[in-house]
Amino acid sequence: MNGRNNDMGRNGGADYDDRDFGRTPDLNADAPGRRRTGRKRVCRYCADKALVIDYKDPQALKYFISERGKVVPRRISGNCARHQRKVTLSIKRARNIALLPFTVTA
């Protein structure tokens, strides 16, 4: 015997060294089931300072509303946190004065 317990325990009888269990995963390897998202989007309002977020412009705000009438999240729209808050506030104001619908009818 080599000093180890000889029963068929957790490792099914395989003879592993202790260092095999404490190994850190390879951080450069792609995780299975995850997709690469490509390039990070740049906030259009930070890139072009001439663009303004206005609640009275429903055509510009429709880009940030989904088909069901929900506000599109930052990770999809590409806005920075500051401009996403302003877009959300503008959408809510436009809904209150009936420039944008609260829900989309089928």
Curated annotation (Swiss-Prot):
<dbReference type="InterPro" id="IPR001648">
    <property type="entry name" value="Ribosomal_bS18"/>
</dbReference>
<comment type="function">
    <text>Binds as a heterodimer with protein bS6 to the central domain of the 16S rRNA, where it helps stabilize the platform of the 30S subunit.</text>
</comment>
<dbReference type="InterPro" id="IPR036870">
    <property type="entry name" value="Ribosomal_bS18_sf"/>
</dbReference>
<comment type="similarity">
    <text>Belongs to the bacterial ribosomal protein bS18 family.</text>
</comment>
<dbReference type="GO" id="GO:0070181">
    <property type="term" value="F:small ribosomal subunit rRNA binding"/>
</dbReference>
<feature type="region of interest" description="Disordered">
    <location>
        <begin position="1"/>
        <end position="39"/>
    </location>
</feature>
<dbReference type="InterPro" id="IPR018275">
    <property type="entry name" value="Ribosomal_bS18_CS"/>
</dbReference>
<dbReference type="GO" id="GO:0006412">
    <property type="term" value="P:translation"/>
</dbReference>
<protein>
    <recommendedName>
        <fullName>Small ribosomal subunit protein bS18</fullName>
    </recommendedName>
</protein>
<keyword id="KW-0699">rRNA-binding</keyword>
<dbReference type="GO" id="GO:0022627">
    <property type="term" value="C:cytosolic small ribosomal subunit"/>
</dbReference>
<keyword id="KW-0689">Ribosomal protein</keyword>
<dbReference type="GO" id="GO:0003735">
    <property type="term" value="F:structural constituent of ribosome"/>
</dbReference>
<comment type="subunit">
    <text>Part of the 30S ribosomal subunit. Forms a tight heterodimer with protein bS6.</text>
</comment>
<dbReference type="Pfam" id="PF01084">
    <property type="entry name" value="Ribosomal_S18"/>
</dbReference>
<keyword id="KW-0687">Ribonucleoprotein</keyword>
<keyword id="KW-0694">RNA-binding</keyword>
